[in-house]
């Protein structure tokens, strides 16, 4: 199985998502973050489960949609996947954001 490495910025993204949602509902914030985390675990078993990020169009940079969030990840090699960002689907994503 492939190891999944969370970048510092992806961890920060997850914290910001939690804090934003928790302002209204701590319970829903926990549910949302747990859902994202569990879907990320599925990437380790099937790295190509996500689609190629349309804005980037590189085979190794992919995304998995979880609710209204895009989990952007890079297949670094046969043994490692890096979680690059977690973006709300309404936000624009440019190469400079990775």
Regions found by a protein language model. Give the residues of each.
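Basic/aromatic recognition patch in beta-strand/loop cores that engages polyanionic ligands
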Residues: 49-77
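Basic, Lys/Arg-enriched alpha-helical interface segments
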Residues: 3-60
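Enriched for short, Lys/Arg-rich terminal
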Residues: 66-69, 74-98
């Amino acid at each position: 199985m492939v190891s999944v490495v969370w970048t510092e910025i992806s961890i920060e993204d997850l914290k910001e998502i939690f804090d934003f949602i928790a302002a209204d509902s701590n319970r829903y914030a926990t549910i949302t973050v747990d859902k994202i985390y569990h879907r990320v675990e599925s990437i380790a078993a099937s790295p190509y489960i996500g689609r190629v990020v349309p804005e980037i169009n590189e085979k190794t940079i992919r995304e998995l949609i979880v609710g209204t969030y895009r989990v952007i990840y890079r297949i670094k090699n046969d043994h490692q996947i890096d979680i690059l960002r977690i973006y709300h689907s309404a936000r624009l994503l440019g190469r400079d954001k990775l």
